[in-house]
């Protein structure tokens, strides 16, 4: 089975938005004031932090994260990170997992906008996350309310210590003026700005993974629901990156072999007003974009001629019958 979601009590932004600090998408730790005990790159590892008893290296106890030496002077340590995409940040996770006697008492995050790979010395940094008290061996979820899109972050540790993981959840910003008329764009791609509105069940894997680039690495890299023991079906609602006319749909069940859905269908609508929460009820009555279609294991299923002519839409509801796993969902369309 896919690994269960580690923290079911995590805020909604951790399931809705992409991790802009994911190195698989292009994020990079550029510079750190110190990384004596553990390199800065480990802080961005997309996998959960682990602890290996008895593992040591030339610098001491091996730790899964970024860890600086004990500071014996004034000041604090910091690390500059280039985000995978310019984006608006809605929340962060400062994770000190397995750091107990060596975590920072506090941390903050600054942000800037720069066209350069590494921000210049005169870059203007703004406070994104003010100084926040940290505790050992736990996640620290911080909401962010700042509408500006940033390209780089500076993580400050006060005064030193170790940070297991940095997650930066946000919505990428794309220059849509460069999209050619009639060009097919994946309107469900998370890197284009699409996001998950809601899903009725995400027991074995969050539905937002369906919107990630590339094919799934394994069965854990996708949306998987628990086994349904009652009538009905499972579903997920996606807000498209831009309003558009959907011309082609791809439903990928990569790595799902004994647990793929028997069938799928799609509903869609152009929504104006309301909130994400209000869409859950409305979506039950949206018109059908794609009637029920059979699915097979470990395959990309492409639908074009089967799509209804609904015109421009902003949201889609994927129904899987009755349950199971979907690795990726691609909604190729023309911008409205």
From Swiss-Prot:
Domain of life of the source: Bacteria
One Pfam family it belongs to: Allantoicase
Pathway linked to the protein: Nitrogen metabolism; (S)-allantoin degradation; (S)-ureidoglycolate from allantoate (aminidohydrolase route): step 1/1
GO biological process: allantoin catabolic process; purine nucleobase metabolic process
Catalytic activity: allantoate + H2O = (S)-ureidoglycolate + urea
GO molecular function, one term: allantoicase activity
Key word Translocase present: no
Enzyme class, UniProt record, top EC level: hydrolase
Assigned keywords, A-Z: Hydrolase, Purine metabolism
E.C. no: 3.5.3.4
Family: Belongs to the allantoicase family.
Full protein name: Probable allantoicase 2
Organism: Burkholderia pseudomallei (strain K96243)
């Amino acid at each position: 089975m896919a690994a269960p979601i580690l923290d079911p009590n995590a805020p909604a932004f951790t399931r809705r938005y992409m991790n802009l600090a994911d190195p698989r998408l292009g994020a990079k730790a550029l510079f750190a004031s110190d990384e004596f005990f553990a390199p800065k790159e480990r802080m961005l590892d997309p996998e959960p932090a682990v602890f290996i008893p008895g593992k040591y290296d030339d610098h001491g106890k091996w730790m899964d994260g970024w860890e600086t030496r004990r500071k014996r002077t004034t000041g604090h340590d910091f690390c500059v990170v280039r985000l995978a995409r310019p984006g608006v940040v809605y929340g962060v996770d400062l994770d000190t997992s397995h750091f107990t006697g060596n975590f920072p008492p506090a941390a903050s995050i600054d942000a800037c906008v720069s066209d350069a790979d590494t921000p210049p010395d005169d870059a203007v940094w703004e406070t994104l996350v003010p100084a926040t008290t940290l505790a050992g061996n736990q996640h620290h979820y911080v909401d962010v309310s700042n509408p500006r899109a940033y390209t780089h972050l500076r993580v400050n540790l006060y005064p030193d210590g170790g940070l297991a993981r940095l997650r930066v959840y946000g919505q990428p910003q794309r220059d849509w003026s460069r999209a050619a008329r009639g060009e097919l764009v994946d309107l469900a791609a998370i890197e284009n700005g699409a996001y998950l509105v809601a899903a009725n069940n995400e027991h074995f894997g969050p539905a937002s993974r369906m919107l990630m680039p590339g094919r799934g690495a394994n069965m854990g890299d996708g949306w998987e629901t628990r086994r349904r023991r009652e009538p009905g079906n499972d579903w997920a609602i996606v807000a498209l990156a831009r309003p558009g006319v959907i011309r082609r749909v791809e439903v990928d069940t990569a790595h799902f072999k004994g647990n793929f859905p028997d069938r799928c269908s799609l509903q869609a609508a152009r929504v104006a007003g309301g909130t994400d929460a209000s869409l859950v009820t409305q979506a039950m009555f949206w018109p059908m974009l794609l009637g029920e279609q059979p699915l097979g294991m470990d395959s990309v299923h492409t639908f074009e001629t089967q799509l209804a002519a609904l015109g421009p839409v902003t949201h889609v509801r994927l129904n899987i019958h009755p349950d199971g796993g979907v690795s990726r969902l691609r909604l190729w369309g023309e911008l409205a």
